[in-house]
From Swiss-Prot:
Residues in USP domain copies: 176-520
Binding site for Zn(2+) 3: C76, C79, H93, H99
Protein species of origin: Homo sapiens (Human)
PTM comment text: Phosphorylated in G2/M phase, but not in G1 phase by CDK1. Ubiquitinated and subsequently degraded in a CDC20-dependent manner.
Tissue-level expression: Moderately expressed in various tissues including heart and skeletal muscle, and weakly expressed in lung and liver.
Effect listed in the UniProt record for changing H479A: Impairs its function as a positive modulator of androgen receptor transactivation
Active site as annotated: C185 (nucleophile), H479 (proton acceptor)
PROSITE patterns: USP_1, USP_2, USP_3, ZF_UBP
Name of protein: Ubiquitin carboxyl-terminal hydrolase 22
UniProt-recorded Gene Ontology molecular function terms: cysteine-type deubiquitinase activity; enzyme binding; histone H2A deubiquitinase activity; histone H2B deubiquitinase activity; transcription coactivator activity; zinc ion binding
Modified residues (N6-acetyllysine): K129
Mapped zinc finger ranges (UBP-type): 21-138
Domain of life: Eukaryota
Length: 525
């Protein structure tokens, strides 16, 4: 069922007026300034309409027992206590203090420990809706979606399926194999990564795409919306993505045909077509960056890469910022000279990765990507300060990080003299801090020397791994598979139609071709 803003004013009042009576245990809470207190909780810890409130929620809302913020956190309505619902820390508090009411900090529902269920109260519901609407307006999304009006078919489906599906920690909904239609493993592994991208999933499952194409049947975004519905329908039989393949062939003709294609090339082509077909989904909202729009693809995948070219004579700096969807990283063993790895002793731990002598890490690749590069005498530029052509250095850094960072390890080398696959093992972490590679951190690095970030509390640049695409075989003959994170620590291997459970060790020991990381903390604009 799609959740959208409720109608305002009289319609909402009429809806609430016919609601059933609420919980009989609310009397102990509804005293003195209870409405003011409840509004404060919704404003600060549930809907969080302002940037300041969202930052406060991200930093403050952790379980007071285990220090975790992901296990369905609830807040006591009688005192300042946050506790996990999943691990029953909030239950223990309620029993010890006899505080029988708590609020779900994700969805705003009120839970009664005496009733052992979420409860309804007309007065509380009015406050919740009012504060939610205020938060939407602060974020500029309050008027984006109309009230959901089910079709006749949807009404019939609701009659035959009145029960809500309960999602448990062992639930595998969203996992579904894909039939290989003839060397289409390159497409299947990318589809698995996209369908398990949290914000993309939320976008499509909330029916937010508004197609403006003359022929919706040719819209790749409409097909992706249908694909998400198929993946999260609960069906376990492998899906046949024939229509998706046809649309990709239609809109990206260089990928047409049954020969093996590059998964990275397919990813970029798919994002490009989705970006072009998302016209209208941003509801006319202007993008902050003129180089990209505000469609869901750009909101999730687009970052800004800063290039600083420094004159070696006057040291004047020319800066440009370009959008990117992925970061392609050179590997040792390629014809491109690789920066010396791992200076110093063995056994270092850098950015959460085991850094052993002779082992290449993702951090090594990023260090090389962001180091200053001397352009040489054959690539002189005209300096605006010197008014003449001078030698210069160029350095790339991250000006703006995307919500989903995709790292492309350049394993396929094509040159005039050779075509080969680079099989160098690259160690990559479950959690990644991109702070050292930001343009704002450039001053902390001198001459390309890596330094640990001094502000360990800077969570804006921290990422978690959620998908890995691998290539087995040679350049001429190979096969793509992917690892997908379903829950916090549950991983599955997707090999076309076959889905099997995988361990974290299986994931981290894999070769790695495309690495997908998701921001741990989000700040909505």
């Amino acid at each position: 069922m799609v959740s959208r803003p409720e109608p305002e004013g009289e319609a909402m009042d009429a809806e609430l007026a016919v609601a059933p009576p609420g919980c009989s245990h609310l009397g102990s809470f509804k005293v003195d300034n209870w409405k003011q207190n409840l509004r404060a909780i919704y404003q600060c810890f549930v809907w969080s309409g302002t940037a300041e409130a969202r930052k406060r929620k991200a930093k403050s809302c952790i379980c007071h027992v285990c220090g975790v913020h992901l296990n369905r956190l609830h807040s006591c309505l009688y005192c300042v206590f946050f506790g996990c619902f999943t691990k029953k820390h909030i239950h223990e508090h309620a029993k010890a203090k006899r505080h029988n009411l708590a609020i779900d900090l994700m969805y705003g529902g009120i839970y009664c420990f005496l009733c052992q269920d979420y409860i309804y109260d007309k007065d509380m519901e009015i406050i919740a809706k009012e504060e939610q609407r205020k938060a939407w307006k602060m974020q500029g999304v309050g008027e984006k979606f109309s009230t959901w009006e089910p079709t006749k078919r949807e009404l019939e489906l609701l009659k035959h399926n009145p029960k809500r599906r309960k999602i448990t920690s062992n639930c595998t909904i969203g996992l579904r194999g894909l039939i290989n239609l003839g060397n289409t493993c390159f497409m299947n592994c990318i589809v698995q990564a996209l369908t398990h991208t949290p914000l993309l999933r939320d976008f499509f499952l909330s029916d937010r795409h508004r197609c403006e194409m003359q022929s919706p049947s040719s819209c790749l975004v409409c097909e992706m919306s249908s694909l998400f519905q198929e993946f999260y329908s609960g069906h376990r039989s492998p899906h046949i993505p024939y229509k998706l393949l046809h649309l990709v062939w239609t809109h990206a003709r260089h990928l047409a045909g049954y020969e093996q294609q590059d998964a990275h090339e397919f990813l970029i082509a798919a994002l490009d077509v989705l970006h072009r077909h998302c016209k209208g989904d941003d509801n006319g909202k202007k993008a902050n960056n003129p180089n990209h729009c505000n469609c869901i693809i750009d909101q999730i995948f687009t970052g800004g890469l800063q290039s600083d070219v420094t004159c070696q004579v006057c040291h004047g700096v020319s800066t440009t910022i370009d959008p990117f969807w992925d970061i392609s990283l050179d590997l040792p063993g390629s014809s491109t000279p690789f920066w010396p790895l791992s200076p110093g002793s063995e056994g270092n731990v850098v950015n959460g990765e085991s850094h052993v002598s002779g082992t290449t890490t993702l951090t090594d690749c990023l260090r090389r990507f962001t180091r200053p590069e001397h352009l040489g005498s054959s690539a002189k530029i005209k300096c605006s300060g010197c008014h003449s052509y001078q030698e210069s250095t160029k350095q790339l850094t991250m000006k703006k990080l995307p919500i989903v960072a995709c790292f492309h390890l350049k394993r396929f080398e094509h040159s005039a003299k050779l075509r080969r696959k680079i099989t160098t093992y690259v160690s990559f972490p479950l959690e990644l801090d991109m702070t050292p590679f930001m343009a704002s951190s450039k001053e902390s690095r001198m001459n390309g020397q890596y330094q640990q970030p001094t502000d360990s509390l800077n969570n804006d640049n921290k990422y978690s791994l959620f998908a890995v695409v691998n290539h087995q075989g040679t350049l001429e003959s190979g096969h793509y598979t992917s690892f997908i994170r379903q829950h916090k620590d549950q991983w599955f291997k997707c090999d076309d139609a076959i889905i099997t459970k995988a361990s974290i060790k299986d994931v981290l020991d894999s070769e790695g071709y495309l690495l997908f990381y998701h921001k741990q903390f989000l700040e909505y604009e």
